[in-house]
Amino acid sequence: MQDRQKAQDYRALLLADTPLIDVRAPIEFEQGAMPGAINLPLMIDDERAAVGTCYKRQGADAALALGHRLVCGDIRQQRLEAWKAAYQRFPNGYLCCARGGQRSHIVQRWLQETGIDCPLIEGGYKALRQTAIQATWQLAQKPILLIGGCTGSGKTQLVRQQPNGVDLEGLARHRGSSFGRTLNPQLSQASFENKLAVELLKINARQTLKRWVLEDEGRTIGANHLPECLRERMAQAPIAVVEDPFALRLERLREEYFIRMHHDFTHAYGDEAGWQAYSEYLHHGLFAIRRRLGLQRFAELTDTLDRALAEQLSSGSTDGHMAWLVPLLNEYYDPMYRYQLEKKAANIVFRGTWQEVANWLKAQ
């Protein structure tokens, strides 16, 4: 057996993007997994549920026997071939189950019978998860600087350019607003937190870190919420506010939401289905804030959106979208953000255009 038979240096494993062959049931994997893990379960959900019920009623020996009866013959062989293929693809990988218990040991033993010595994570996913939680808490204690500004100010781009910048929206796969979803579905809360922890660990390991640079976010980014330890620190953090001309903000939003999203949808689904998905995406974003707009205003902007989509479909022009985007910014997004920023006015340490804020950051 290899020297790396069991692993307890969890931070090193996370920092190295160590491939994990996660043998938990799909439902467990969906609830939370580590970045880079692939789910090749020993038991699928129904099998796991049956074994769990048996364990409660008849004890461990009966549950283990049932598990072996459920995963035998062709089913066992198919799963074994999948684990072998995964190990051949990731020879530096580790087996991982919930706590480093029966499931990963069984898979390890079956692989040994074929001549493959695959190490396992001692303590399993639970140990890695605790390491991620502790790392986030520890690293969140470092100083933080927030980048603020109204929608379309280029905050995310500015954060990404900083060597100590953490793109929270990229990690969450969501841009924060009602139009913020991307083509990639959001991760579960635990998986998002795990991914954030690994990102913090990596950035911290690359350099002598004086502070984090983050975008000024609310408690939630789409369906994901920020860890409370980080959110508490952000609430007290200094803020550099980007104040770009309205016309420049509109051009950024045009590029991001009308040109790039249209391209991404059609690239993913084809012209016809992609257009339908793009149209539904814009309608859904507007629908999500209908009560805050008022139903009459929502209906008016929806009609304008429909006309803009018809124009874009027929001519390729995105100009028509300005007729509903401009009032949406003026009547909803800008007042909302300015109200939120006003409550944190004492934290503002710099204001300027995007380039001025970028230059200020370099000088710090």
UniProtKB/Swiss-Prot annotation:
Sequence ranges assigned to domain Rhodanese in this UniProt record: 14-137
Keywords of this entry: Selenium, Transferase
Annotated catalytic residues: 97 (s-selanylcysteine intermediate)
Domain of life: Bacteria
SUPFAM superfamilies according to UniProt: Rhodanese/Cell cycle control phosphatase
An annotated Gene Ontology molecular function: transferase activity, transferring alkyl or aryl (other than methyl) groups
Keyword Transferase: yes
CDD domains documented for this protein: RHOD_YbbB
GO biological process: tRNA wobble uridine modification
EC assignment: 2.9.1.3
Catalytic activity from the UniProt record: 5-methylaminomethyl-2-thiouridine(34) in tRNA + selenophosphate + (2E)-geranyl diphosphate + H2O + H(+) = 5-methylaminomethyl-2-selenouridine(34) in tRNA + (2E)-thiogeraniol + phosphate + diphosphate; 5-methylaminomethyl-2-thiouridine(34) in tRNA + (2E)-geranyl diphosphate = 5-methylaminomethyl-S-(2E)-geranyl-thiouridine(34) in tRNA + diphosphate; 5-methylaminomethyl-S-(2E)-geranyl-thiouridine(34) in tRNA + selenophosphate + H(+) = 5-methylaminomethyl-2-(Se-phospho)selenouridine(34) in tRNA + (2E)-thiogeraniol; 5-methylaminomethyl-2-(Se-phospho)selenouridine(34) in tRNA + H2O = 5-methylaminomethyl-2-selenouridine(34) in tRNA + phosphate
Recorded family membership: Belongs to the SelU family.
Subunit relationships: Monomer.
Functional description taken from the UniProt entry: Involved in the post-transcriptional modification of the uridine at the wobble position (U34) of tRNA(Lys), tRNA(Glu) and tRNA(Gln). Catalyzes the conversion of 2-thiouridine (S2U-RNA) to 2-selenouridine (Se2U-RNA). Acts in a two-step process involving geranylation of 2-thiouridine (S2U) to S-geranyl-2-thiouridine (geS2U) and subsequent selenation of the latter derivative to 2-selenouridine (Se2U) in the tRNA chain.
Record protein name field: tRNA 2-selenouridine synthase
Organism: Salmonella gallinarum (strain 287/91 / NCTC 13346)
Protein encoded by which gene: selU
